[in-house]
A protein has these predicted regions:
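An acidic-aromatic substrate-binding cleft motif
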Residues: 131-183, 188-208, 395-398, 784-807
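Beta-sheet-dominated interaction scaffolds and their linkers
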Residues: 633, 637-701
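Contiguous, structured surface segment used for ligand recognition
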Residues: 1-156
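C-terminal non-catalytic alpha-helical accessory regions
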Residues: 138-143, 478-636, 853-855, 873
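Gly/Pro-rich turn-and-neighbor structural signature
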Residues: 147-148, 218-221, 226-229, 256-394, ...
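Extracytoplasmic
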Residues: 689-957
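Structured mid-domain segments that build the active-site/substrate or prosthetic-cofactor binding neighborhood
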Residues: 198, 203-206, 216, 374-380, ...
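The substrate-binding groove and active-site-proximal loops of carbohydrate-active enzymes
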Residues: 106-109, 171-187, 206-215, 252-270, ...
Length: 957
């Protein structure tokens, strides 16, 4: 007797039949036995099949299955939980005597996609990855499928109606890959794309469009027909209306063309209307979300710079009216039944809102039932969101989000550089503001974006599991995702893979690969470069260790592991390391240090390694990803790859006599000891009472032997080594470790009072003697726990290190239920250094002093007077069209001052320099004057408008 047989009605949708066959293939991958897929028309035939199997799996769709109707009539099942719903499914186990003791698993879908998701639920339970086809991941082996009645379930409606991705910026990577593997952009490639989308519980796709023509490349309409068969809802990109792509117009236009030769609704109105009409006639019969509106060719503004806002709005209003009439004529007389979308992308956002002088399109009759697709700023930060009043819009709202971008200030397209906590923080905000109708994410070439894409679509499908209630759950998601892909690996290896994923994405999102260059991280200050290099080494070592384990213990997973984990991690970290080393090379070259050449050699090795990684990726698994790594990614000097540069390295020629330079670690101070240059250096580390050790580094400047010796030091300080020789060849630098004995220092200090006392360190060099003053913090005040003390001339406080936190409540009129509690919560591992604080619920507005929540920080300074407070914030954008992203500051119970985190005239996008710096650095800084008293000060930071995310505070004179 067979363990499993799939049985389906002959009348079932062909797409469901194809998916059932794929799931049967999944069962074969797990058990090495492929179940048969049989068809019939009646319960009698089902009973006959039941004699031959332990379990018969019966997929069926409500409204398209006579079998479901009969079983419901006979009271064997109840479909009330799924009937009339969208994309729901139920698993019903039946064990009637007429089926000879055989277990029947009835997978009932509320519609085609519901049935498909129900089928793929079996694959999930068997440990089959959604990337089984895309990446070739084999599931763990099992002897039996082991279906049990306890697995019965009903899956509710997905949280977001339309959920999908956009294949974009596809040249040179995705396009090259398509041509080499599939001969173009036809059904042979979209077969895999559609399967991937459905396995990820998506339902909506924008196809490749730089050079592709989805409606022609199938060949012909084959792509569209295949999408319809699988239940994929198609759309065109944000600037391709009426089911026509920009490349189609390029291909069809001409002086003798019926479509004219100008993408201009004023001068070529009839030609453009004909072009749109033919697109609707060709593809309007399929399931689509039709893009409305009109932008310029190649993703540009439709009218020139001289056009007024009113000109643009009136043109767009005319376009929308015309398009709705065409849809009514060509698709459905009741245009309200046709899903339509207008993307408020870039300049179109301004046309929607208008200004004080010109009314925008908000509330326009032409948009009454149209989905309004809002957008991020192309760097993962949301732009405007619906106000409470706007959320009544019948068509609902969508969000166009980016994991890939081709545009100013710098493109990022090569490898995933997006971070899950960022996606969570932004997309939960979108959902809570009512953006629930459509989520579409730009995934570029798809390859290497599998991890964040999974998270995006899982959140869209089940917001209750991964949305607002899942604060600080991205690490858990990462572990689950790792288990989903590599379930046969040991738990220890799975944990290490999850650590690599979290580690590299957190580090890379701080500065994306294409935007990375020498000196982005300071070579010495705050150990920025050193700490980052050490973190890269840690992650790469772990990745290499796991890779070695995979090759030895699970070689059949090597290709998938490389594609999903190793290549993205190693590629991006190696690139970042290369630029960090280039920065060290340039810094040391300015000192004349021969050690700069070692860094230069290391840069060259990184560049070589970059080429090796891309080549190996292309060759892996018989060329499975050939072409996918082709995007330029090193040293962008413009927004795109034009004139991009490999790192510039400096070669230092040796001096012709013994010379060395003494540097104080973490500072730019250096000296050779010349008697003509007698200014002392200072080592400030021991001003921090928690500091026990510090460093001084000596670099050789010549290939002649250069001796040094510590000739004077405080007795409370140990130095090692005390002397040595640099030869400029095998030994061209020396690190001296300085360790303080604070007990001995306290016993031997001279009795002076104050904040610090100094020791002196002298180092004899070939050029003379270097003198280094070493101040030490003393007489620290006794302060309450949680109080920061100024010992080094500044105070740094992570946002999560508050002394007190006070809850507030939502301001009247801004959120339903004004007495709802609002409080700051910590988002762990989010931000440049440690974490971030944000007020929840995210839609709440606050009035400082009345209802706004606040964070309170305590700090001690020795001198009263004016200080500068620098706030480090996420580079968020205002959620409303008022250009306000506000917070309040209060020091020592004084006046609460309100500040806007963005300047007047704030501009997102092209030539918005303030915005650009924020998104490239992944941080926004704002300096504020504060008046402090001697002793303990109390600083409060209030949340005023949604979107304020605080990471760190710096106070200095």
């Amino acid at each position: 007797m067979e363990e499993i047989i799939f049985w389906m009605e002959d009348a079932a949708d062909s797409g469901v039949k194809k998916i059932a066959d794929k799931v049967a293939g999944d069962v074969e991958l797990v058990t090495d036995r492929r179940p048969r897929v049989l068809y019939g028309t009646s319960q009698e035939e089902l009973a006959d099949v039941a004699e031959r199997a332990e379990t018969v799996i019966v997929p069926a769709t409500v409204g398209k299955s006579r079998l479901l109707e009969q079983m419901e009539e006979e009271k064997r099942i109840g479909l009330e939980q799924i009937r009339g719903k969208r994309e729901c499914y139920g698993w019903f186990f039946l064990n009637d005597p007429e089926w000879h003791g055989t277990q029947i698993l009835l997978i009932a879908g509320s519609d085609k996609r519901g049935t498909i998701y129900g089928l793929f639920h079996l694959s999930e339970l068997l440990g089959v990855s959604p990337f089984v086809d895309w990446c070739g991941i084999r599931p763990p082996h099992r002897e039996h499928v082991g279906l049990r009645a306890s697995m019965a379930c009903v899956a509710g409606e997905p949280s977001v109606r339309y959920r999908g991705f956009f294949i974009n910026d596809e040249w040179p990577a995705f396009g090259t890959w398509c041509n080499r593997r599939f001969g173009g952009f036809g059904t042979s490639v979209y077969e895999h794309v559609f399967e991937l989308l459905l396995r990820l519980k998506g339902n909506y796709l924008w196809p490749a469009m730089w050079s592709a023509r989805f409606g022609d490349d199938g060949p012909g309409l084959a792509n569209a027909k295949l999408a319809d068969e699988y239940g994929i809802i198609m759309g065109m990109s944000h600037h391709e209306p009426c089911l026509r792509q920009g490349e189609e117009y390029k291909y069809l236009r001409g002086k003798d063309s019926v479509y004219g030769d100008a993408w201009n609704f004023r001068t070529n109105r009839e030609g453009i209307i004909r072009f749109w009409k033919d697109g609707l006639l060709r593809r309007g019969k399929f399931e689509n979300v039709i893009t409305l509106g009109m932008r310029g060719e190649a993703d540009t503004a439709i009218l020139g710079e001289k056009a007024t806002l009113e000109d643009n709005i009136e043109l767009l209003r005319d376009v929308l009216k015309t398009q709705n009439e065409l849809i009514r004529e060509c698709v459905d007389e009741d245009v309200k039944r046709v899903p339509r979308m207008l993307a408020l992308y870039k300049e179109v956002e301004a046309f929607f809102y208008g200004n004080d002088q010109t009314a925008g399109l908000m509330g326009a009759e032409e948009l009454e039932d149209v989905i309004l697709l809002l957008c991020d700023d192309n760097y993962g930060n949301l732009r405007t969101l619906p106000t409470k009043e706007m959320r009544t819009h019948k068509g609902g709202y969508g969000m166009y989000y980016h994991l890939d971008y081709h545009g100013w200030p710098i493109s990022y397209e090569w490898i995933n550089s997006s971070y899950l906590p960022k996606i969570w923080e932004q997309m939960t905000t979108a959902y809570e503001f009512g953006v629930r109708e459509l989520w579409i994410v730009n995934v570029g070439d798809i390859a290497t974006q599998e991890f964040p894409l999974s998270y995006f679509l899982d959140m869209a499908y089940d917001f209750g599991r991964w949305g607002s209630g899942a604060v600080n759950q991205t690490a858990e998601y990462t572990r689950q995702w790792t288990r989903q892909q590599f379930g046969s690996f040991t738990e220890e290896i799975q944990e290490q893979i999850a650590d690599v994923l979290q580690g590299y994405t957190r580090l890379i999102q701080k500065r994306r690969p294409e935007a990375m260059r020498a000196m982005v991280y300071h070579p010495v200050h705050g150990r920025e470069t050193q700490d980052t290099l050490e973190e890269i080494k840690r992650i790469l070592t772990e990745a290499e260790r796991v890779y070695a384990w995979v090759k030895e213990h699970a070689p059949e997973y090597e290709a998938a592991f490389v594609a999903l984990i190793y290549y993205p991690a190693a590629g991006t970290l190696n690139l970042t390391r290369m630029h960090l080393l280039a920065g060290m090379n340039q810094y040391l070259a300015k000192l004349g240090a021969l050690h700069a050449n070692d860094y230069g050699d290391a840069v060259e090795q990184c560049l070589k390694r970059d080429r090796e990684l891309v080549t190996a990726y292309h060759q892996m698994d018989h060329g499975r990803w050939d072409g996918m790594g082709a995007s330029e990614h090193i040293g962008f000097v413009h927004w795109n790859e034009d004139e991009c540069l490999n790192p510039v390295i400096h070669r230092v020629l040796p001096a012709d006599k013994p010379r060395l330079v003494v540097t104080v670690d973490q500072t730019m101070q250096h000296a050779e000891g010349s008697p003509w240059l007698t200014e002392s250096m200072k080592l400030p580390d021991f001003l921090d009472p928690a500091c026990r050790s510090a460093g001084i580094t000596l670099y050789g400047l010549s290939e002649c032997e250069a001796a040094y010796e510590v000739t004077e030091k405080p007795e409370w300080l140990s130095v090692w080594p005390m002397q040595g020789v640099l030869d400029g060849k095998k030994h061209n630098y020396e690190k001296l470790e300085l360790v303080i004995n604070r007990e001995r220092w306290a016993m031997n200090r001279d009795g002076n009072t104050g904040t610090s006392a100094c020791g002196v360190l002298e180092i004899k060099t070939p050029s003379g003697c270097c003198r280094i003053e070493i101040p030490v913090c003393e007489n620290l005040p006794e302060v309450p726990e949680g109080t920061f003390v100024d010992t080094a001339g500044y105070i740094v406080m992570e946002a999560e290190h508050y002394a007190d936190r006070k809850d507030g409540y939502a301001a009247d009129g801004k959120r339903e239920g004004k007495n709802e509690k609002v409080r700051f919560q910590c988002i762990r591992d989010y931000g440049k250094t440690r974490s971030a604080m944000k007020a929840f619920p995210v839609t709440a507005y606050g009035v400082p002093g009345e209802n706004a929540p606040y964070l309170e920080y305590h700090f001690w300074v020795s001198k009263p007077g004016g200080y500068v407070l620098t706030l480090y914030m996420q580079p968020s954008n205002p959620v409303a069209n008022d250009q306000k992203l506000c917070y309040g500051v209060q020091n020592n119970g004084g006046e609460i001052r309100i500040y806007n985190a963005v300047p007047e005239g704030y501009r997102i996008g092209d030539q918005g320099e303030f915005w650009a710096k924020g998104v490239l650095d992944q941080i926004r800084r704002q300096e504020i004057p504060v008046s402090c008293r001697s002793g303990i000060n109390c600083l409060r930071i209030y949340s005023v408008t949604p979107g304020f995310v605080l990471e760190k505070l710096l106070i200095r004179p």
